[in-house]
Amino acid sequence: MSKKLVSLFLALLMICSMANVTAENNTITVTDMFGREITIEGPVTRVIAMEPSDCEILYALGCGDALVGRGKYCDYPAAVLEVPAVQAGQELNLEEILALNSQVVIMADMAQTKEQVTLLEQNGVKVIVTDGNNIEEVYENIRLLGKIMGKEAEAEAVITDMQKTFADVAAKSEKTEKTIYFEVMPLEWGLWSAGANTFMHELAEICGMKNAFADIEGWQQVSQEQVIERNPDYIVLVTGMGETAVDEVMGRAGWENITAIKNGAVYNADSYAMTRPAPRLAEAVVNLYNFLNGVTE
């Protein structure tokens, strides 16, 4: 074989090798919060995010432009309202999703998620399932979406910012035996609160407080009698019931001897920042600290 042919052969081998490396580099494999290993052909530039928290994470990573669809309840930041909305939760609409031709659909772990994942994947849609009960799982979600979007460094930066805020608040918070009752669902719908292994429980601890329902696990329904018996020092409302929420709680029959009611220590929190497993939990803990310590901005 002549030197010229050898050189040509080696050049072809190099080109093929580079092509294989490029193909491998464009393949993204992740394990979602269901423990499922998912392989996606990258780069990922077309995404549907069904949950508000996942939309917020994507924007925090600088990936808002990749959103071609959003769940109808996704509303932050304001720019996301320009993205086409699709039905979410139990009302998921397969045709709407298929029409948007996304590379991946990101959805949260809910009661109907397994059936919906099966339906979507049977129709050729890649699905990533997220979950975020506690702060560590929020970090996992951020890293997961960061890997999918090729924004791993940005994901770590977002997490570092959150950790710094939590550490700063914890450092200036005195430990106390005082308790917080988080009202997640209002009385008219049946009271629900946050227990152990939730990010709300952890926000209370960061602020030096105890969770009045630390003995329950996750998010559970509670009774008026339980709230009255536990006599919380503070009540934090994350019900999204608007400006009248505090007045409604202050006027509840039988609650008048609760310490929080007697002291007027009822806080109508930004329910979106405090209920979504997303970067704005850092904002939520600052606001919670300010309420607990009487700090005005």
Language-model features: locations:
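A short, structured surface patch at a secondary-structure boundary
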Residues: 45-100, 104-110, 209
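Alpha-helical, coiled-coil/dimerization segments enriched in small aliphatic residues
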Residues: 73-76, 192-219
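Structured C-terminal subdomain patch of bacterial secreted/periplasmic proteins
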Residues: 24, 46, 92, 137-140, ...
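Extracytoplasmic ligand-binding site segments that recognize negatively charged/polar headgroups
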Residues: 113-115, 130-144, 177-199, 243-244
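A ligand-binding cleft/hinge motif common to bilobed small-molecule-binding domains
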Residues: 111-122, 229, 234-252
